[in-house]
């Protein structure tokens, strides 16, 4: 119920299969050396953390965090270090804090990348994270944070 970003901040997230499809499409495009093409959700399909909260709650069949959420500093999270196992289950507290610091720093940037060039090349719009978050919840159900991190940080 606490993290570094605001619930109104947005995040630019795409599914890995969309990224793979875009990369395959780009292999057949005549791009100039050094030309940049962002594979991203873009402004239109990025989502607010408040939207993620509601979609996660629906997927988990529980109430959203909503008004109970508090935007806090990293120092506050460090002070909560001993509570992390109660929140996330068995985990390495130090590694969790490091991950929260890295992800939190990115999330607070509230960055969205322009995918206009990619879309103009014929790539369809990506799905919004909230459109497939239920699949993410289902495929990670029963996995601890360390088990998920083992896959994420290979």
What are the residue ranges of the model-derived segments?
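Glycine/proline-rich active-site loop of Rossmann-fold NAD(P)-dependent oxidoreductases
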Residues: 26-37
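Glycine-rich Rossmann NAD(P)(H)-binding loop
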Residues: 4-9, 37-47, 52, 56-57, ...
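A hydrophobic C-terminal alpha-helical subdomain
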Residues: 1-6, 75-124
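Substrate-positioning beta->alpha
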Residues: 6-27
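Amphipathic terminal alpha-helices
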Residues: 55, 66, 70-72, 101-154
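Short, flexible loop/turn elements at secondary-structure junctions
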Residues: 15-18, 40-45, 117
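Short aromatic/basic micro-patch
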Residues: 13, 46, 112
């Amino acid at each position: 119920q606490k993290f570094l970003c605001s619930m109104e901040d947005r995040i630019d997230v795409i599914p890995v299969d969309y990224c793979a499809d875009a990369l395959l499409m780009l292999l057949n495009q005549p791009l100039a050396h050094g030309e940049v093409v962002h594979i991203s959700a873009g402004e239109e399909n990025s989502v607010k953390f408040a939207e993620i909260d509601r979609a996660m709650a629906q997927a988990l069949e529980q109430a959203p965090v909503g008004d109970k959420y508090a935007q806090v500093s990293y120092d506050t999270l460090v002070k909560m270090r001993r509570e992390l196992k109660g929140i996330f289950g068995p985990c390495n507290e130090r590694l969790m804090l490091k991950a929260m610091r890295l992800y939190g720093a990115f999330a607070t940037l509230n960055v969205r990348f322009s995918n206009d060039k990619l879309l103009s090349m014929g790539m369809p719009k990506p799905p919004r994270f909230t459109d497939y978050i239920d699949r993410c919840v289902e495929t990670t159900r029963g996995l601890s944070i360390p088990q998920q991190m083992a896959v994420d940080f290979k």
